[in-house]
Each structure stands twice: as C-alpha cells, then as structure tokens.
C-alpha cells in the first residue's frame, strides 16, 4: 500500500497547526493594540514573550515625577520627545519607596526598604538581622547586606554573564565609605558629584568583597571603550549620572542649572553612544526611568499590590510606594511612539531582566501576579 496519503495527511496537520498558531499570535497582537488619542500606539498587558535581548542598559534619573519628566512642558525635550518617539513609554511605572537609595536596591535585588535605607543611608551601616520573610526579604536594619542576600549581578556572574556599573565621578572604582562610617558623598562637591546612595552595587557585601569589584564598578568614562564591540559590552550596563547630570541638584555646585535641563544635556551626549553601539544594534535594550517621584510629600503612590514591607510599614514614608515616574524602553523589539498602561514598578523591572537572562526571581520580583514586560512592551518584531 502506498504511504503517500499518510505523508500528505501529516503534512496537512503540520500546515494546519502552523496556520492556527500564526492566527493565534496575530489575534493576540490585534487584541493588544489600540490607538491613543495622541496618535501613539497603546498596548495592553500580555505576558509570556521575551525577545532574544542579550545586552541591557539601565539609566536612572533622580526625583522626577511622571508629569514633569514626560509631560508636554518637560524641561528635557530630548528625553520626553526625541527619545520617547523611538520606543514604548510605560506610563504607569512606579517607584517602590522614598527616598532614593531603596529604589536602586529594589532594581538590583528585590529587597524592600527599612528606615535607614529610607533615610538614604547617611551612615554606611552594616545590615543586622538573622531572619527572612517571604518573598525573600532580609529582616533587620541597616544598609549593607550580607553576602547571603542575592542580587542580579551575582546571579549574572553565577551564570557566566557579565555586568558593570558605570558611575559618573566615582573616580576610584568600587568606591564606598568605610563600613559603619558617615557617608561623605551625601552632598556634591566641585569636581566630585558622585553619590554612593545612587550606586546600589555598594550595598551588597558579595559585590564589595569580591576581588573583581574594581573591574566591574567603574567610572562612566570607561563606557565608550566598552561599547566599541559587542564582545566588550557587558550583558548588563547599569549607568548612573552624577548628582547634577541625574537632575538631583538644582542648581549644581559647579554652576550648571541641574534638574531636567542637565538631564537633557547629559542624555544628548551619552544615549547616542549607546544607541550607535554594536551591542545595542544587535540585541540591545535601553531602559530610562527615575528612582522616585519628587518627594514623599508630593507622591507616595504605588502599584502592583505593594504594601507594608517586613522592615517598613510605609515604603514611601507617607504612602505605599515611590510615586508614578514612568519609564521608557528602547529596543528593536519596541514599536516607535508606543505606550503601555500596564502597571509596573522597580520590582517588575528586576523580574523582567531576570526573564531576559533566564534567572530565578529575587525578593519582591517573586510576587505572585507581578507584571513583567511582555508583548505590551515588546510590541515590534516579535514575529521576525
């Protein structure tokens, strides 16, 4: 008996399945795409898709609420208009705490705040605590976590992936105060506007005690050299401007205006270097956000079910979070001039980065139901 009809039947089944799968994916995209009143494309949350990103760049600006950064009268038009037109704006993205320091720590570890962290760690104090609470929270007080507390950088290293923190004005690599001493970088100085509290790597003993900390936590001036090729660009590049260029100070100690005007000028210099790099062009993603809204008094709102933490009943001091700040994601997998209304926060960002690098979730990134970037963010080129 001829077997040709059997082969044809199998082929038809495979073809039918492929067509059905394609229609399902197309239908999913159709369902998530809508047209906003301002002409931008809005997307609703869809989970389960992670593009083949291999190089991620994260930039934080300081203490800027959503309206001041992204609104029509923004003093940073390069960010709010030029760059915004190139990617997807997450317009319900929130900080997780007040003041600055715990937001940076949240992005790298999923750890919630405690009172010392909420006070920006005026003393570079040892974290003291012997217990944990779900989800993955170290219970105690202080700022510098023991080696037992995990972080995204240590996860990456364990998997053979690379990372670097690029800190403007750090000068000496891996620079931090003496343990349990007052932090002398709380206020900018002429010629040195580095702030330890904006360098979250320095709050994990597993990093600061590592033999290669000085190779991985470096001055921003090293970034152009590392961007020269994809092979020399870390899988994670975490970039922190100084206290003037991140918009924290206004005016700045060197006479510049500070605020969003200085943010705008800094981004115009550094973002093109990233966007034109081989790593970004090949498989890169750039995330630009703020650490928190302007102040605990102006906005301490939260999203994503954030509530009391084991070490702080009010992570935002006057409320549950760090306020609405927004975030911009640029990538070949993000559609220009698009936006997402899905609620996200810094724990969502951590979980999304762990998705990209196929890592287990840390701390509050484990939260059940926490939104992670999906087709609402990666809304372009998913079928290419």
Please state what every model-predicted region is.
Residues 39-384:
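N-terminal pro-sequences and low-complexity stem/linker regions of secreted or lumenal proteins
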Residues 2, 7-40:
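Secretory targeting and sorting signals
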């Amino acid at each position: 008996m001829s077997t040709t009809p059997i082969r044809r039947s199998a082929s038809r089944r495979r073809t039918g399945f492929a067509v059905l799968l394609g229609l399902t994916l197309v239908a999913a995209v159709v369902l998530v795409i809508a047209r906003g009143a301002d002409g931008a494309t809005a997307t609703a949350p869809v989970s389960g898709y992670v593009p083949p990103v291999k190089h991620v760049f994260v930039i934080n600006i300081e203490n800027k609420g959503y309206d001041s950064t992204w609104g029509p009268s923004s003093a940073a038009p390069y960010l709010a208009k030029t760059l915004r037109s190139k990617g997807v704006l997450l317009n319900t993205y929130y900080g997780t705490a007040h003041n600055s320091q715990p937001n940076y720590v949240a992005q790298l570890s999923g750890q919630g705040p405690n009172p010392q962290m909420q006070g920006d760690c005026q003393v570079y104090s040892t974290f003291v605590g012997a217990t944990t609470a779900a989800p993955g929270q170290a219970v105690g007080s202080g700022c510098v976590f023991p080696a037992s507390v995990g972080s995204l950088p240590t996860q990456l290293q364990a998997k053979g992936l690379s990372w670097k923190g690029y800190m403007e004005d750090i000068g000496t690599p891996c620079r931090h105060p003496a343990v349990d001493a007052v932090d002398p970088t709380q206020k900018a100085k002429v010629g040195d506007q580095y702030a330890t509290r904006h360098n979250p790597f320095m709050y994990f003993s597993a990093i600061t005690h590592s033999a290669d900390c000085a190779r991985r936590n470096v001055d921003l001036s090293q970034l152009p050299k590392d961007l020269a090729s994809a092979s020399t660009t870390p899988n994670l590049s975490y970039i922190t401007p100084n206290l003037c260029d991140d918009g924290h100070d206004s005016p700045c100690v060197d006479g510049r205006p500070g605020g969003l005007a200085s943010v705008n000028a800094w981004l115009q210099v550094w973002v093109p270097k990233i966007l034109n790099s081989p790593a970004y062009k090949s498989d890169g993603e750039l995330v630009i956000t703020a650490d928190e809204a302007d102040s605990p008094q102006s906005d301490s709102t939260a999203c994503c079910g954030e509530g009391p933490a084991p070490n702080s009943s009010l992570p935002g001091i006057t409320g549950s979070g760090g306020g609405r700040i927004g975030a911009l994601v640029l990538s070949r997998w993000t559609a220009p001039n698009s936006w997402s209304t899905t609620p996200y926060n810094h724990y969502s960002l951590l979980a999304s980065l762990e998705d990209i690098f196929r890592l287990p979730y840390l701390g509050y990134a484990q939260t059940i139901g926490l939104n992670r970037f999906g087709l609402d963010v990666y809304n372009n080129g998913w079928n290419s």
